[in-house]
Swiss-Prot record:
A GO MF term: methyltransferase activity
UniProt keyword list: 4Fe-4S, Cobalt, Iron, Iron-sulfur, Metal-binding, Methanogenesis, Methyltransferase, Transferase
Subunit structure: Heterodimer of delta and gamma chains. The ACDS complex is made up of alpha, epsilon, beta, gamma and delta chains with a probable stoichiometry of (alpha(2)epsilon(2))(4)-beta(8)-(gamma(1)delta(1))(8).
Enzyme Commission number(s): 2.1.1.245
Function: Part of a complex that catalyzes the reversible cleavage of acetyl-CoA, allowing growth on acetate as sole source of carbon and energy.
Keyword Metal-binding belongs to the record: yes
Protein origin, superkingdom: Archaea
Gene designation per UniProt: cdhE1
Pathway: One-carbon metabolism; methanogenesis from acetate
Family annotation (PANTHER family): ACETYL-COA DECARBONYLASE_SYNTHASE COMPLEX SUBUNIT GAMMA, PTHR36214
Official protein name in the record: Acetyl-CoA decarbonylase/synthase complex subunit gamma 1
Cofactor(s) needed by this chain: corrinoid; [4Fe-4S] cluster
Length: 468
C-alpha cells in the first residue's frame, strides 16, 4: 500500500457523501480503505461513473498491497495468500494467515486416498471462539502418470478443498487441469527446465503457479520476472526448503531477503512465498514421531518468518495443532483485540435460582471462564461486559470496566437481577474486587467476590452457593 492516511485516499473519492457505500461520509469510507476493511468496489459512483475512472485506477494502484495477493481454489473455501504491507506486525498487521496444505499421493489406494482427504477436510479445533481448520490438499504425482494423477485429482476435487498439483512434468499437470478446470488449483512447479510449458499451462487455464529455483534468488527473481512479462500475475515463490544444517539457515535467510525486497518496493519479487516443511521427512529421520516434531519446528520457523503457504505431511494432532495455534496467534490483528459480543449468555439451561457471573468480552477471558464453568456442570448466567476486548484486570485499571459499565451491560441485555433471579446476587471476578461496593450501590444487589482464577469457580460455588 503506497498511502497510509485517509486524507490521501479521500482525494480520489467522489467526495459527495452519498452514503451508498454504507458510510455517512467519504472520509469515513476512506478510513475503511486504509485499514483494508473496505474495497473501492464498495463505492458505486466511483466504479460506475466514467468521470471517476482515472481516479479509481490510481486509487487501486495506491491501495494495492506491497506483496501480491494470490487466491487458490474457489468459493467460500478459497485460500488467499500474500497481501502484506509490512515486515513487522506491530507496524500495521499481517493479512491472510499462513495456509497449510497436507499431502496425498496419486499412488495411494482409492480408499486410503479418500480417507486421508476427508481427514484433512474434517480436521478442526475450537479455539477462542472459532474453529481452526486445515486449508487444502497437495496432490503429489508420485507415479508420474498423467492418467493416474487425473484420477486422483478427480477424487480429491469432490471434497471441495483448494488444491496444489505437485509435479515437474507438464503433461501430468495438464491432465490434472483437464479434470479440475474450474477449481483454480495452484501448479507446483515451474523450474529452469520446464518453465515454458508450465507457464503456458498457467496462461491457458488461468491458474496460479509456483516458480521454483532452489537457493538461487537471482535465478528465482529472473524466472518470476519472465512469467510476469508473459502476463502471468498470480505467482508464488519457492526458494527451496532445506530441512537441516546450513541448508536450513540459507532457507531462512532467503525468506528474509525475498520479503524485505518485496516490501521495500522490488515488484519483480513481491509475491507470496511457499515453504515445504514436509522435507523434514527427507532428512534421514527414521522415527515418525521425531520426523513430525521436526516438521512442526520448520513450519513454526516459517510461519513466523514470511511463509505464506506450506505443504506438510503429518496429520497427527501433536504436529498439526501447534502449527495451527501458532499461525492463529501470529496473524491476530494487534489493532483489534479478539472479542465476543457483549451480552448475557446461558451456560446450560439456567433458571431464576441459577448463579449470575460476569466477565469481560475479551475472547480468551470469556471462553476460558465459560469452559471452566460448563466443564464442571455449573448451570448459570454469564454476562460479557463490553470492555473493547480487554481482560478483567487491565480493564479495571484502565477504566474500561466500571460499575456503570456493568449496569449498562445488564440493561442492554434486558436482564434485571431483582426480577429475573430469586436471589438478587451477582458474582464478580476476584480481579475486580475493588468494584464490589460501587456495584452494590449501582445495582442494588448483593455482590459476592469470586475467585481470582476461573478454574477455582467450581470449588467456590460448592462452598458459597446458594447464598445464605
Amino acid at each position: 500500500m503506497k498511502i497510509n492516511s485517509p486524507l490521501e485516499a479521500y482525494k480520489y473519492l467522489p467526495q459527495t457523501n452519498c452514503g451508498e457505500c454504507g458510510e455517512p461520509t467519504c472520509m469515513a469510507f476512506a478510513s475503511k480503505l486504509i485499514d483494508r476493511s473496505g474495497k473501492t468496489s464498495d463505492c458505486p459512483p466511483l466504479v460506475k461513473e466514467k468521470k471517476y475512472a482515472k481516479k479509481l485506477a490510481e486509487l487501486d494502484r495506491l491501495l494495492a498491497p506491497e506483496i501480491r495477493q494470490v487466491t487458490i481454489g474457489v468459493g467460500e473455501k478459497a485460500a488467499n495468500i500474500g497481501g502484506d504491507d509490512v515486515l513487522y506486525r506491530h507496524k500495521l498487521t499481517f493479512f491472510n494467515k499462513t495456509k497449510m496444505f497436507f499431502d496425498v499421493s496419486d499412488n495411494m489406494e482409492e480408499d486410503a486416498l479418500i480417507e486421508r482427504v476427508k481427514k484433512i477436510a474434517d480436521f478442526k479445533k475450537f479455539y477462542v471462539g472459532r474453529n481452526l481448520l486445515l486449508d487444502g490438499v497437495a496432490i503429489k504425482a508420485t507415479s508420474n502418470d498423467p492418467a493416474k494423477f487425473a484420477a486422483a485429482v478427480k477424487k480429491v476435487a469432490e471434497i471441495g478443498l483448494p488444491m496444489i498439483f505437485c509435479s515437474f512434468n507438464p503433461a501430468v499437470l495438464k491432465a490434472g487441469l483437464e479434470v479440475a478446470k474450474d477449481k483454480n488449483p495452484l501448479l507446483y512447479a515451474a523450474n529452469k527446465d520446464n518453465w515454458k510449458e508450465v507457464g503456458e499451462l498457467a496462461l491457458e487455464y488461468k491458474v496460479p503457479v509456483v516458480v521454483s529455483v532452489f537457493n538461487d534468488l537471482d535465478g528465482l527473481k529472473s524466472l518470476a520476472k519472465t512469467f510476469a512479462e508473459a502476463g502471468i500475475k498470480d505467482i508464488v515463490l519457492d526458494p527451496g526448503t532445506y530441512p537441516s544444517g546450513k541448508g536450513l539457515k540459507d532457507t531462512f535467510t532467503n525468506f528474509l531477503k525475498i520479503r524485505r525486497a518485496g516490501i521495500m518496493g522490488d515488484t519483480e519479487i513481491a509475491y507470496p512465498i511457499m515453504a515445504l516443511p514436509l522435507t523434514a521427512w527427507m532428512a534421514g529421520i527414521s522415527d515418525p514421531v521425531s520426523a513430525s516434531y521436526w516438521e512442526t519446528v520448520i513450519a513454526s520457523v516459517f510461519t513466523i518468518r514470511y511463509g505464506d503457504i506450506m505443504i506438510l505431511h503429518s496429520l497427527e494432532p501433536y504436529a498439526a495443532l501447534p502449527e495451527m495455534h501458532l499461525a492463529e496467534t501470529i496473524y491476530t490483528d494487534p489493532r483489534t483485540p479478539v472479542s465476543v459480543d457483549g451480552g448475557m449468555y446461558k451456560v446450560g439451561e439456567p433458571d431464576k435460582d441459577s448463579p449470575v457471573f460476569f466477565t469481560t468480552n475479551f475472547a480468551l477471558t470469556y471462553y476460558t471462564v465459560e469452559s471452566d464453568i460448563s466443564a464442571n456442570g455449573i448451570v448459570c448466567w454469564l454476562l460479557a461486559v463490553d470492555t473493547d476486548g480487554i481482560g478483567v484486570e487491565a480493564a479495571v485499571a484502565g477504566g474500561q470496566l466500571t460499575s456503570a459499565k456493568v449496569k449498562d451491560a445488564f440493561e442492554k441485555a434486558g436482564f434485571d437481577l431483582k426480577t429475573d433471579t430469586n436471589h438478587n446476587t451477582l458474582i464478580i471476578p476476584g480481579l475486580s474486587a475493588r468494584l464490589q461496593g460501587d456495584l452494590e450501590d449501582t445495582l442494588g444487589a448483593n455482590v459476592k467476590v469470586g475467585p481470582m482464577d476461573s478454574g477455582r469457580i467450581p470449588g467456590w460455588v460448592e462452598k458459597n452457593w446458594p447464598p445464605k
